[in-house]
Every structure is written in structure tokens, then in C-alpha cells.
Amino acid sequence: MAGMSALKRLAPFAHVGGHLFRGRCARAAGARGVRRAGGGAHIEPRYRQFPQLTRSQVIQAEFFSATMWFWILWRFWHDSDAVLGHFPYPDPSQWTDEELGIPPDDED
């Protein structure tokens, strides 16, 4: 009994799968399906030429570029340690000869 109820629940999926299989065979035979495209390319490609940009694309590019550089420069100005390092460079005059590996003067 439990097996039959599981098969009944899977029946709609088998039905849809059959439509997908028949649709693929029909397209292979040359039948045309429903085309849901909005025509050709929005901007036709041109061989070895810079693409023709719309005014909207130029404005969007300028906006995102300005936003990116503002963010980079803002973060660099206010949190430069993230780029340059978190710790101050040590003062070499404070280093001892022992730390530098220099033997004491009294040794021959």
C-alpha cells in the first residue's frame, strides 16, 4: 500500500518528464517551439571595433567607477593600517647588539 501512494505522488513528474522528452525529439526533427526572446542583441557586435555604448551605460559606468574609487580612497585615508600594516616600524636605535647578533666587545 505504501508503495502505491508513492507512485501516485510521482505520477505528475513522470507526465512532465514525458513532455520534455517529446519536446526534445520534436525540436530535433525540425519543429519550432515557442521562442521567448526579445529580438536580436541589444547592441550588435562589431568586428575589431569598440562597442557602441548607450548614454545610460556610460552614466552607470561613471557612477560605479566613482563609487569604487571613493570607497578605496576613503578606506585608505581612514584605515591605512589595513594596507600599510598594523604595527609601527620598530626604532633601530632601540635594538641591542645581542638582538642583532653582534658579539660583545670584550671577546677577542
Swiss-Prot record:
Belongs to the complex I NDUFB2 subunit family. The gene is NDUFB2. It holds the Pfam family NADH_B2. GO terms for biological process: mitochondrial respiratory chain complex I assembly. Signal peptide: none annotated. The keyword Electron transport applies. The keyword Membrane applies. GO terms for cellular component: mitochondrial inner membrane; mitochondrion; respiratory chain complex I. The lineage of its organism: Eukaryota, Metazoa, Chordata, Craniata, Vertebrata. Its main location: mitochondrion. Residues 96-108 have a biased composition (Acidic residues). It is a peripheral membrane protein. This is NADH dehydrogenase [ubiquinone] 1 beta subcomplex subunit 2, mitochondrial. It is found in: Mitochondrion inner membrane. Residues 89-108 are annotated as: Disordered. Complex I is composed of 45 different subunits. It comes from Bos taurus (Bovine). It comes from the Eukaryota. Residues 1-36 form a transit peptide. Keywords: Electron transport, Membrane, Mitochondrion, Mitochondrion inner membrane, Respiratory chain, Transit peptide, Transport. Accessory subunit of the mitochondrial membrane respiratory chain NADH dehydrogenase (Complex I), that is believed not to be involved in catalysis. Complex I functions in the transfer of electrons from NADH to the respiratory chain. The immediate electron acceptor for the enzyme is believed to be ubiquinone.
